[in-house]
């Protein structure tokens, strides 16, 4: 059985971050263990030094007072003071560093377990839905095959049966038809539910990813605070620990917590590689060219299924238009909505776009089969190269790979496109200051990019694009082969300025 989660980029990114976080937690525990040993040594040394100071004091009590004995008395007091310093240092390390660190680590461990359970729960829903779809499909295929055999029996025996036998067979055929329609609807609904469970899992991964990043920031802040407190206590030792403290202070003075946090963000950043999610498509008995069903029969059964998809496509398209209008209103009227409303609407837009893509892929597949049966030219659709099949025993399964940027970038793009939807064509607008200089800059496509909107450019790996404007939200505007449009900045690499000058002169 094919695993729908194995090759998911979301899953890989989340697991990489978990591994990174686990390494950071192990380091934090090792540092805390070292501090505990240091505290034990300080307390043990303080006790030993206190005993020596007491012995020296007793010896001085039985000694005649003199300049020498007075000097040794100061030495005894010095031992006591030093012992007190070591005692305070050991206790301070325990109370201000070790105890808070273990408390934070325990809370973080519970939080990680909760996040892992949440991810596992939603992942199981995806796998369960995937298996339910295949099970429902197999059941539908068997029922369709039996129904078709019964249908053929009725058709072939009409002339040789009595009216009573005909009624009996027709009643049986009617019940079979009702059962088949019920199983067909059940299969269709499970297929439609597949995208929502997948979205829930991806959103859970996204949220858990952000939560673990926050735990990493907290851990880095904790380690920095421990170092600062450690530095303050060491400073109290005075001249005897100056050399050691100087070395530590130099190292601590170089700490830039913002830089550390930025390093974590960069090291665990989501790569801008194209994310393609796999979704099962509906497969029907009527599509099997090797079935015993005749051509006209197959066409008559495929058309209602195609009409159902077209109705859903029309509804999803209207929903899309409504959501686009809402986003434009939010963008143009800042007092009308808050950031949460805009984000929620963008999420609904993303969900609707995914549903529309899946419906169109199913519709294209059935339309292609119907065109083949009616000997018409094959329809064209951008998803034609994204539909794949694999065979399992006597069944063939179809699935589509839909390009989907990662959630944060995806929602930013939706809001950005909605806010710019009412503006004039970028190609005909007045260039801003510096635009003439920028237009001579070039970039090279690192990955292929399939445009999903009319104002986007199709990119192939190695294409050289002229940059006209660098927009916010990770999208640039440029031209390729005379066509202007937007393209994702993460898919290209900007060439040196001399490359742009050379291209301009040419």
From Swiss-Prot:
Keywords: Cell membrane, Coiled coil, Cytoplasm, Cytoplasmic vesicle, Cytoskeleton, Endocytosis, Membrane, Nucleus, Phosphoprotein, SH3 domain. Residues 292-372 form the REM-1 domain. GO terms for molecular function: DNA binding. Residues 160-222 form a coiled coil. Pfam families: FCH, SH3_9. The modification Phosphoserine is found at residues 114, 479. Residues 1-260 form the F-BAR domain. GO terms for cellular component: cytoskeleton; endocytic vesicle membrane; nucleus; plasma membrane. InterPro entries: AH/BAR_dom_sf, F_BAR, FCH_dom, HR1_rho-bd, HR1_rpt_sf, Nostrin_SH3, SH3-like_dom_sf, SH3_domain. Residues 438-497 form the SH3 domain. GO terms for biological process: endocytosis; negative regulation of DNA-templated transcription; signal transduction. Expressed at highest levels in heart, kidney, placenta and lung, and at lowest levels in brain, thymus and spleen. Present in vascular endothelial cells and placenta. Over-expressed in placenta from women with pre-eclampsia (at protein level). The keyword Phosphoprotein applies. Multivalent adapter protein which may decrease NOS3 activity by inducing its translocation away from the plasma membrane. Homotrimer. Interacts with DAB2. Interacts with NOS3, DNM2, WASL and CAV1. Interacts (via SH3 domain) with DNM2; this interaction allows the recruitment of NOS3 to dynamin-positive structures. The SH3 domain mediates interaction with NOS3, DNM2 and WASL. The F-BAR domain is necessary for membrane targeting. This is Nostrin. It comes from Homo sapiens (Human). The lineage of its organism: Eukaryota, Metazoa, Chordata, Craniata, Vertebrata.
